[in-house]
């Protein structure tokens, strides 16, 4: 709400993992869970909280794990940033928003979780393989 109060032309985006409902709430008006599931923890509520009800979201996207995880893996390999799946989802959403808006826009997102919390899933090649998720070559068995 505060961003829009300061600049009405700001575009606010929201990302949700598969199986969550906020994307549907902002795009369809009902908080119905999307198809699928996600291994990414700590994101994707299935009820509308007061702060969400007041949000002025312009673009909402559902991001699946196969789209999000490569961003988290690339940031670790190329930038030395060990981030979690929520950060990967946020980056994937920022990329989608950038594609939607086109050139000449500034996109800001939040990288909000450390990857070391998810070692048993995010950095476990056996787990990723069992879930049919991408495994970076540097993590392969």
Where are these regions (language model features)?
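Short glycine/serine/threonine-rich phosphate/pyrophosphate-binding segments
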Residues: 1, 22, 86-94
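Surface-exposed amphipathic alpha-helices with a cationic face
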Residues: 1-7, 98
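Active-site/ligand-binding loops adjacent to catalytic centers
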Residues: 5-85, 122-141
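Phosphate-binding loop/pocket of nucleotide- and phosphate-handling active sites
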Residues: 37, 92-141
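A short, small-residue-rich loop immediately preceding and capping a beta-strand
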Residues: 81-87, 108-111
């Amino acid at each position: 709400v505060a961003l829009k109060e300061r600049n009405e032309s700001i575009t606010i985006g929201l990302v949700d993992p598969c199986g969550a409902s906020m994307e549907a709430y902002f795009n369809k008006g009902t908080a119905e869970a999307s198809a699928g599931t996600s291994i990414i923890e700590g994101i994707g509520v299935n009820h509308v909280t007061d702060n969400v009800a007041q949000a002025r979201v312009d673009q909402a996207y559902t991001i699946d794990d196969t789209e999000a995880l490569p961003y988290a893996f690339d940031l670790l390999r190329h930038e030395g940033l060990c981030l979690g799946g929520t950060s990967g989802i946020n980056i994937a959403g920022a990329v989608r928003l950038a594609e939607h808006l086109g050139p000449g826009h500034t996109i800001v997102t939040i990288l909000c979780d450390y990857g070391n919390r998810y070692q048993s899933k995010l950095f476990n090649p056996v787990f990723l393989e069992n879930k049919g998720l991408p495994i970076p070559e540097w993590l392969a068995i």
